[in-house]
Amino acid sequence: YPYATELTRESTRVQQQANLDRAIRRLETDIAGQAVTTVQNATNAESAATVQAQMAAQQQLLSRMQSLKASGRIALELKPERPEYPDLPLEDGDNIIIPTRPGFVSVFGAVLAENAFIHRKDATVDDYLERAGLLREADIDAALIIRADGSVEGNTAHRRWFGGGGFMGKELQPGDAIFVPEKFDRRS
């Protein structure tokens, strides 16, 4: 399945890990600053409980991020119908894997049924999310398609002036995945 070819490189992995570590430090700082402000603004026991729940959710996110390890994968951004490999010089130690064609699309995150669904030609993001079911706290505006070729597409419809974007109508390829994050209350 050439579309899903994986190219991993050690120098890329090192750079990705450095970027991830910086993002974690930034998130730690943001959480600490937000915690102080939010606790100071809590006016009663109910709002204090809400603040505590928000802080627990943010700590969970931080813990998950801290457990991530960079892969070194380079997204080749191939066309599914006619994958052509880019003219990219190889380095010693590069690893290339051409997987077999999967027959599914994965859906995970804030959904009722995290699952791998049978790939259906012409099925869209909306079709797969309907099968998985969205949780009440699903943040569909921040949903992502993680393509089998390693590229990622975000839901940019809410950032476009004329309501375009078409995220929910995008077709998926075998091996693609949809991630739907949870909404976090960003009040301070």
Regions found by a protein language model. Name each.
Residues Y1-S188:
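Ser/Thr/Pro/Gly-biased, low-complexity, turn-/loop-rich segments
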